[in-house]
């Protein structure tokens, strides 16, 4: 009887290489690195995996060299606290990024992974159909436009960011 079973629904049978999947991070990090060097800022990486943080740190160090800090959440400081203290949060397809938007914090969604792996469900705001780009998001890779979106959102105040995004 099928009522005594449960179903696990897998995503489409996508065959994606690790290098292809994480090329989105590499592309975005190169832009962030350029901006941070121009503005004299450090990039703070909000670590995702407590148990694999050395592996994650090494990934970022390879791209950013020494131009970053690495925050690991704890009982005293959660990922939400780290985001709340940031001038701007940038994400590719993190749930925490969308949560940060809903909390009214200046956030930029650079949802370029869908274009890279040919899967529209990675586009910004999916499943809602959104324009391919807006004042604080983009769903395709355009180096110069991404650069401009990040710089613009860093430079505007929170009130203007909210008025443009809500």
Predicted feature locations:
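Surface-exposed alpha-helical segments enriched in charged/polar residues
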Residues: 30-37, 84, 147, 151
């Amino acid at each position: 009887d099928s009522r005594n079973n449960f179903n696990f629904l897998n995503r489409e049978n996508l065959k994606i290489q690790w290098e292809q999947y994480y090329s989105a991070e590499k592309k975005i990090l190169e832009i962030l690195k350029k901006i941070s060097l121009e503005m004299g800022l450090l990039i703070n990486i909000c670590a995702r995996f407590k148990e694999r943080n050395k592996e994650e740190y090494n990934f970022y160090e390879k791209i950013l060299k020494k131009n970053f800090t690495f925050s690991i959440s704890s009982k005293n400081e959660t990922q939400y606290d780290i985001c709340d203290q940031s001038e701007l949060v940038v994400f590719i397809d993190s749930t925490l990024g969308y949560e940060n938007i809903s909390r009214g914090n200046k956030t930029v969604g650079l949802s370029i992974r869908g274009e890279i792996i040919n899967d529209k469900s990675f586009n910004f705001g999916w499943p809602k159909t959104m324009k391919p780009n807006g004042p604080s998001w983009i769903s395709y890779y355009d180096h110069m436009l991404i650069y401009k979106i990040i710089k613009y959102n860093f430079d505007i105040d929170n009130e203007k960011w909210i008025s443009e995004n809500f």
